Amino acid sequence: HLVSLQVYHYLHCINALRRAAYQHVYGAPTKEHLNHLDHCIDMLRQAAQCQSDLTPMLYFNPENDPNTMLIKSHQHSCRRFDLVNEWAMARSQCKGNTTCAIEVGKQVGGEM
């Protein structure tokens, strides 16, 4: 079985989309890669809907200006990714790889 935390899957998908956006650097995606990108877009859509982040977003929209601008100074209350990553790596059977095959029946990780 493969085991990984969903956060690593999200980061993988964001990186895949980033690479597709910079085709001039990474090359055009193949048909198989485009199918993978569709999967990534849907996975991130599901994450956004499931997590339903309620952080208020402030916009600047002067009168008669057709261009609404997002003010990027909003604060999120987040988990500390460095601590999540440290926790996951301490329990990994994969020596730093975020996804690996685990032998069936083998004990994985430790206490939560």
From Swiss-Prot:
It comes from the Eukaryota. It is an enzyme of class 1 (oxidoreductase). Keywords: Oxidoreductase, Virulence. It holds the Pfam family UstYa. A motif (HXXHC 1) lies at residues 9-13. This is UstYa family oxidase VicYb. It comes from Bipolaris victoriae (strain FI3). GO terms for molecular function: oxidoreductase activity. GO terms for biological process: mycotoxin biosynthetic process. Belongs to the ustYa family. The 2 HXXHC motifs are conserved in ustYa family proteins and might form active sites. Pathway: Mycotoxin biosynthesis. A motif (HXXHC 2) lies at residues 36-40. UstYa family oxidase, part of the gene cluster that mediates the biosynthesis of the secondary metabolite victorin, the molecular basis for Victoria blight of oats. Within the pathway, vicYb catalyzes the oxidative cyclization of the core peptide. The pathway starts with the processing of the precursor vicA1 by several endopeptidases including kexin proteases as well as the cluster-specific S28 family peptidases vicPa and vicPb to produce 7 identical copies of the hexapeptide Gly-Leu-Lys-Leu-Ala-Phe. Disruption phenotype: Impairs the production of victorin or of any victorin derivative or intermediate. InterPro entries: UstYa-like. Its EC number is 1.-.-.-.
